[in-house]
Amino acid sequence: MTEEKINPMQKVKIEKVVLNVGAIGDELDKGFRLLKLLSNGKPAKMKSKKRIPTLNVRPGLEVGAVVTLRKNFPELLKKLLIAENNTFRKKQVSENNFSFGIKEYIEIPGMEYQRDIGIMGLDVTVVFKRTGRRVGLRKIKRGKVSKRQRVSPSEIIKFMEENFQTKFIGK
């Protein structure tokens, strides 16, 4: 009958959900519209920093769109997880984050085919944190945050299984 008390500073939380589409030219505009439609947020276009001659990428060229959701994301996250059947590989989980890709946005429940967008996929990254992370990130009076405050892959898997009923397979 005695419940194990958890230190409130050790609780795992979701910090943000990042949706990303990588494309160039017209595909980038379609990806931009897709992210706007999915998230009801304002996507930002990403510019390349390095030259990659084999891909015809030069510095300053817009190569993708990204939107970060910090509030009101649990409903969208549940839909995105359902699109992948709530089953993931353990390799997709790393320290402090969990990433997966969706091949076609029409797999997401509630999303219908948009003729002006066509068929597109997107990448989803879920970033985790513990309370007190801001101490290491702030600009004034920055402090050190110990390694214990990082969220391990096993803790992420446990959190996702308890709160979102996901299954992780593999080693």
Language-model-detected regions and their locations in the chain:
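Ribosome-associated RNA-binding proteins
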Residues: 1-171
